[in-house]
Amino acid sequence: MAEKAPPGLNRKTSRSTLSLPPEPVDIIRSKTCSRRVKINVGGLNHEVLWRTPDRLPRTRLGKLRDCNTHESLLEVCDDYNLGHNEYFFDRHPGAFTSILNFYRTGKLHMMEEMCALSVGQELDYWGIDEIYLESCCQARYHQKKEQMNEELRREAETMRDGEGEEFDNTCCPEKRKKSRDLLEKPNSSVAAKILAIVSNLFIVLSTIALSLNTLPELQEMDEFGQPNDNPQLAHVEAVCNAWFTMEYLLRFLSSPNKWKFFKGPLNVIDLLAILPYYVTIFLTESNKSVLQFQNVRRVVQIFRIMRILRILKLARHSTGLQSLGFTLRRSYNELGLLILFLAMGIMIFSSLVFFAEKDADATKFTSIPASFWWATITMTTVGYGDIYPKTLLGKSVGGLCCIAGVLVIALPIPIIVPPFSEFYKEQKRQEKAIKRREALERAKRNGSIVSMNLKDAFARSMELIDVAVEKAGESSSTKDSADDNHLSPSRWKWARKALSETSSNKSYENKYQEVSQKDSHEQLNNTSSSSPQHLSAQKLEMLYNEITKTQPHPAPNPDGQEQPDRPSAYEEEIEMEEVVCPQEQLAVAQGEVIVDMKSTSSIDSFTSCATDFTETERSPLPPLSASHLQMRFPPDLAGTDEHQRARGPPFLMLARGKGPAGRDAILEYAPVDITVSLDASGSKVGSHGPLQPDSASESPKSSLKGSNPLKSRSLRVNFKENRGSAPQTPPSTARPLPVTTADFSLTAPQLISTILLEETPSQGDRPLLGAEGSAHCQGPSKGLSPRFPKQKLFPFSSRERRSFTEIDT
């Protein structure tokens, strides 16, 4: 996990600027410095040798060794910490134990307590194929996986059936939905339960009436001498059939999908239970004559028998009957196998018993088809006794037929019973799940519960923050909080997007100088309150709405136009480090403490300076030997084209908005043994009078850093007008102390003294011109030049910015 250094702590890391991702060289150095690597999976730390993940280079851990950029690392892991050589994966820690053991031993086993589906997901994430599972775990894994897939498939079908029944595009959707729940879901309400009970009573009543109509005592003879239904029972039959018809029509009208309604098995049963009654009435009323009635009598009897199918309507409200139907549909392969075994046995034993009994006296086995009945009742162990063998050979065949029947029937039963039990339990579980889901839906509609996935909430919060930053990116940008992770992937995606939207010539320092226009205290408060870890969805939406309503502030004007006044109560602490020179120490106030600059090296920590700091600790400066600072005034810069100026040597341009000297002063590097200073009025002072324009010589180290786009950034220093005069702070030899811009604002600017800081030779970087504190510049001589008898201080810019000074390195 990439951590931020605490304030005041100077950590010797590969990159001290926390607002930038680590460079590939730093990542490679971190990996090569240690033979071991720390892998943090879900908070559980594992420490292994680098050669362990290298054994499987195509897996996720194997690719970790080859990732040398920030983006590639975040594609493999979720977070990392180069300082501790630690890589974080937000995955199940228990499953990773088995996976890491596979890297070490080459044996992959599945943990007993883990779900098969979860194990499969973990194997897919780490890039390991399930074929590497050992034989002792493969059977259990595939059995559980098949079971889980079947349950998920059934649940998906149930959910799809429920989701497919939408009423949005139909007429009166609310009323139709309520009527459908009333007729199809008995557990949805009390009225639905009452309606289901009444429907079941009509089914039972019609079945009883159908049975009583067959009693001779209750039948009546018609004019042709044929028995007819009892009139009272006929009225009961008519009422029951009217109820069934009304129920079927209401169910059809409330159904969103008519074709799906007709194909439903329970609806087909309802239709077959209703049609025979109307067909019987039509046939009997349309054929009044004796001859016609005799022709349709048998057809009418068949349709009357079909009324018994009404008993199957009970399956609509019975989970057990639905389980039986599901078992028959699911086990049709096993049932077909059972019927095939029985058919083969019947054919074999009926043929054997026929040839064994055909010569016996008064035998009943007259043919093989006549022997089918005996083989069937014998194999099913029924044995009516109406037909049986009499010879010894025939009895032997009968014994073998009984044994074969027991084996044939008993073997498929264990295959058929478990699906019935499982489906019954599954139906009960689904009923409870449906109730729970409906309760959650009602709670969500009422606003009493908010269901949100944590990862979805975090991703949504990050999207809202990115949109908010883009909306306000024209004028200001919030500073990174000290508690937030600076290696957040979404943050770098936004940074890349911001760079791509700008021009190709817009460098990193220009972006950061725009960011630094906002008050640092205000940024800290906003960032701490808008961190995605501490915001709910409502607060994020409010934040987005507020930011989109705010008007963008005007950007800094490089032409020297006056910026809007900022509040006077603005104070910013600048952390500095002691710079020791042979002649004289830095002039700072007594009673203050200096903190290491690298602890707050972010660009956003102060508003007036934008610079880059080196990775190594700063050391006291030796006497300048290579390059020195020289100031010259060209004859006329007003007519010079800006494009031609940009092509000139590196210079420091001092544009004064007000004052007697309104010219542009150019500071350039030249091997001249002089020191340049500027008095309070802006006049130039030098050892040779007005400086002549000459060619500037650059330090040999300056070319080493130009190849790095992240380090070749310009330095901007904003100066402020005089606010009065104050006594000069005497130089102090005590330890450096913190200096604030509020203290400088009370001091009259009298002298600009700059110093050229050199980095350590091991870094190979050219020296940077430090502008974060008051300093002085010395030549190669041991003492100060007599032309400059005094050291004067110049304050840093605060809320007002009058001019801009730029050093292009």
UniProtKB/Swiss-Prot annotation:
Post-translational modification: Phosphorylated. Phosphorylation at Ser-608 of the FFAT motif activates interaction with MOSPD2, VAPA and VAPB.
Biased composition (Basic and acidic residues): 508-522, 798-809
Activity modulation: Inhibited by quinine at micromolar levels. Modestly sensitive to millimolar levels of tetraethylammonium (TEA) and 4-aminopyridine (4-AP).
Tissue expression as described in the entry: Expressed in smooth muscle cells.
Location relative to the cell: Cell membrane; Perikaryon; Cell projection, Dendrite
Residues annotated with Phosphoserine modification: 448, 608
GO terms for biological process, alphabetical: action potential; potassium ion transmembrane transport; potassium ion transport; protein homooligomerization; protein localization to plasma membrane
Stretches that traverse the bilayer: 191-212, 233-254, 266-284, 297-317, 333-354, 396-424
Cytoplasmic-facing ranges: 1-190, 255-265, 318-332, 425-809
Spans annotated as Disordered: 1-22, 503-534, 549-571, 681-742, 757-809
UniProt feature: intramembrane region: 369-380, 381-388
Keyword Transmembrane helix: yes
Keyword Transferase: no
Residue window of motif Selectivity filter: 381-386
Glycosylation sites: 287
GO molecular function, one term: delayed rectifier potassium channel activity
Superkingdom of source: Eukaryota
Pfam families recorded: BTB_2, Ion_trans, Kv2channel
UniProt xrefs under SUPFAM superfamilies: POZ domain, Voltage-gated potassium channels
Membrane topology field: Multi-pass membrane protein
Family: Belongs to the potassium channel family. B (Shab) (TC 1.A.1.2) subfamily. Kv2.2/KCNB2 sub-subfamily.
The record's note on its domains: The transmembrane segment S4 functions as a voltage-sensor and is characterized by a series of positively charged amino acids at every third position. Channel opening and closing is effected by a conformation change that affects the position and orientation of the voltage-sensor paddle formed by S3 and S4 within the membrane. A transmembrane electric field that is positive inside would push the positively charged S4 segment outwards, thereby opening the pore, while a field that is negative inside would pull the S4 segment inwards and close the pore.
Name of the molecule in the record: Potassium voltage-gated channel subfamily B member 2
Upper classification of the organism: Eukaryota, Metazoa, Chordata, Craniata, Vertebrata
